[in-house]
């Protein structure tokens, strides 16, 4: 590693961590309807939205009403996007006259963007019109992220409130998350990207003749606005086929820094938002410490692995300081690895290098980040409510070890809460192991892999892990655009999204109804290094140990077979 690499890492952590406490407090004030510096500008817009939609902002909902509103909104978003994708060829703003998508691909794409996964079995510039990108994909990028933030806020209220029957109003939370939480930051990032050379235009594709005399089509489009929310909303779906490796999505080292930092900017800030809800920022610091520890463990492993020369190329007497196959030279190895670890720590899934070309252990780090349930920062809202589930599981385990009824911040965890927690632990195994096993056992679907042996298994394992974790990245050698995989990965994405959201909202309702006992000397502290260590081990053992046999068949076997 060179001095530039260390400066990149320093700048990345500075951009992410320094504004997090301020931004976290801002989100708390916004979601609770308190006045902020944006209120004079966006307040009238917010109130206008309520009047137009007939929403009573003062009427709160219980957890069942909140859940039904969320499900209805997401179903409507899915149906609208599904229709737009099917009818794309007949709609305006389609200068390339691209046809509508085949039904299974349209189903997969609509589910993908509705669940904040952004798994793409297609290439954007060759399959999706400008109108579809804007009113279909970009809109879902906003509202899927806002949905995750709303669920987190509902859980935070459930933990913080005492003897309460309501969690807030989903429509209000959705509106505030979009207007105040996402739009202003996206505007700033989009302008920065345009400054760096990312296109934002409705012009037709450019047809050019190269110096060699061959014809070339250069795709354009309203890219900067979508890329901004793709990153800040932890969505990840690329405007162009190769995502942020494309020079029009990510043209410079500066744009690379802005984009990779923006992936986890909001998730980190929301940890402090939770601290404001429970009136104890020590809880935020403990959770941040655990997240950073997991991130640094995975990042260090990936950096070490990816800077090792590939034995296969060494035997061919190819000189290499670090493997650059599948990477962009303008980002280098460290910039590519940083993005890989960040995008899989969050439920983002965008890439600036080809994950299929990573050394086996680097690819394994990316998979493990997702297999843990995207709790290392995670998606907007989704990452923290996933982490809070592990916090409650760690508290439950601590209670078992010391023989006390487990409690978190004065709320006792009883049979109903533990049942809901256990239900969430089944989400990743069902999506990855069961659906993945079905795909691997059938000769047709298994033929989607492009490599034999361990790496081919890793391609399939990565696909179903990414879908269930609502990440969206892929080993690009996997041929996902088949009816079987479009439907099965679509189901995995639905399981991964709503398999968490439904128990989380039920848990929030259960906790909100409980009385809160004052914490005394006998209470187990959840803000110190002891609990942080317990939480870290709980995540690794309870969340990760399930997948060790499959990892042994994939990236670990490949690593050993290559002779690293």
Swiss-Prot record:
The keyword Nucleotide-binding does not apply. InterPro entries: KdpA (IPR004623). It is found in: Cell inner membrane. Keywords: Cell inner membrane, Cell membrane, Ion transport, Membrane, Potassium, Potassium transport, Transmembrane, Transmembrane helix, Transport. One of its GO terms (cellular component) is plasma membrane. GO terms for molecular function: P-type potassium transmembrane transporter activity; potassium ion binding. Pfam families: KdpA. It is a multi-pass membrane protein. The keyword Iron does not apply. The chain crosses the membrane at residues 4-24, 67-87, 135-155, 179-199, 258-278, 286-306, 382-402, 420-440, 487-507, 534-554. Belongs to the KdpA family. The system is composed of three essential subunits: KdpA, KdpB and KdpC. NCBIfam families: kdpA (TIGR00680). Part of the high-affinity ATP-driven potassium transport (or Kdp) system, which catalyzes the hydrolysis of ATP coupled with the electrogenic transport of potassium into the cytoplasm. This subunit binds the periplasmic potassium ions and delivers the ions to the membrane domain of KdpB through an intramembrane tunnel. This is Potassium-transporting ATPase potassium-binding subunit.
């Amino acid at each position: 590693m060179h001095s530039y690499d260390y400066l990149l890492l320093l700048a990345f952590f500075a951009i992410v961590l320094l504004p997090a406490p301020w931004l976290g407090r801002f989100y708390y004030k916004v979601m609770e309807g308190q006045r902020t510096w944006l209120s004079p500008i966006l307040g009238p817009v917010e109130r206008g939205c309520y009047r137009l939609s007939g929403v009573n902002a003062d009427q709160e909902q219980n957890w069942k009403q909140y859940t039904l509103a969320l499900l209805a909104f997401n179903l409507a978003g899915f149906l609208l996007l599904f229709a737009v994708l099917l009818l794309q060829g007949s709609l305006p703003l389609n200068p390339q006259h691209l046809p509508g998508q085949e039904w299974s691909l349209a189903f997969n794409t609509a589910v993908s963007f509705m669940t904040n996964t952004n798994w793409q079995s297609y290439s954007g510039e060759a399959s999706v019109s400008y109108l579809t990108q804007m009113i279909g994909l970009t809109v879902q990028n906003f509202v899927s992220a806002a949905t995750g933030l709303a669920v987190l806020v509902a859980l935070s209220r459930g933990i913080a409130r005492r003897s309460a029957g309501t969690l807030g109003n989903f429509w209000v939370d959705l509106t505030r998350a979009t207007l105040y939480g996402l739009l202003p930051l996206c505007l700033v990032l989009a302008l920065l990207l345009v400054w760096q050379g990312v296109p934002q235009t409705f012009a037709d594709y450019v047809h050019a003749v190269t110096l060699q005399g061959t014809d070339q089509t250069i795709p354009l489009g309203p890219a900067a606005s979508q890329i901004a929310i793709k990153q800040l909303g932890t969505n990840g779906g690329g405007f162009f086929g190769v995502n942020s490796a494309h020079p029009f999505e990510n043209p410079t080292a500066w744009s690379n820094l802005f984009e990779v930092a923006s992936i986890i900017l909001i998730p980190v800030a929301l940890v402090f938002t939770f601290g404001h809800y429970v009136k104890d920022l020590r809880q935020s610091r403990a959770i941040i410490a655990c997240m950073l520890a997991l991130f640094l463990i995975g990042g260090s492993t990936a950096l070490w692995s990816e800077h090792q020369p590939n034995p296969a190329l060494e035997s061919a007497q190819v000189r290499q300081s670090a493997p650059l196959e599948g990477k962009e030279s303008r980002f280098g190895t460290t910039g590519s690895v940083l993005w890989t670890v960040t995008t899989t720590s969050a439920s983002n899934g965008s890439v600036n290098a080809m994950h299929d070309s990573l050394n086996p252990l680097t690819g394994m780090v990316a998979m493990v980040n997702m297999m843990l349930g995207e709790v290392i920062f995670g998606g907007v809202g989704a990452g923290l409510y996933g982490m809070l589930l592990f916090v409650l599981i760690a508290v439950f385990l601590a209670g078992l070890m010391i023989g006390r009824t487990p409690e978190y911040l004065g709320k006792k965890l009883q049979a109903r809460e533990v049942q809901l927690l256990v239900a969430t632990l089944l989400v990743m195994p069902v999506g990855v192991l069961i659906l993945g096993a079905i795909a691997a056992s059938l000769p047709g679907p298994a033929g989607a892999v492009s490599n034999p042996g361990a790496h081919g298994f890793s391609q399939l394992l990565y696909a179903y892990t990414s879908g269930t974790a609502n990440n969206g990245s892929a080993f690009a050698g996997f041929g996902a655009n088949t009816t079987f995989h479009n439907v099965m990965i679509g189901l995995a994405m639905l399981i991964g999204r709503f398999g968490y959201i439904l128990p989380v909202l039920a848990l929030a309702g259960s906790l909100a109804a409980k009385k809160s006992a004052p914490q005394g000397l006998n209470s187990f502290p959840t803000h110190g290094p002891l609990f942080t260590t317990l939480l870290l081990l709980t995540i690794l053992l309870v969340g990760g140990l399930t997948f060790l046999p499959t990892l042994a068949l994939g990236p670990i076997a490949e690593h050993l077979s290559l002779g690293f």
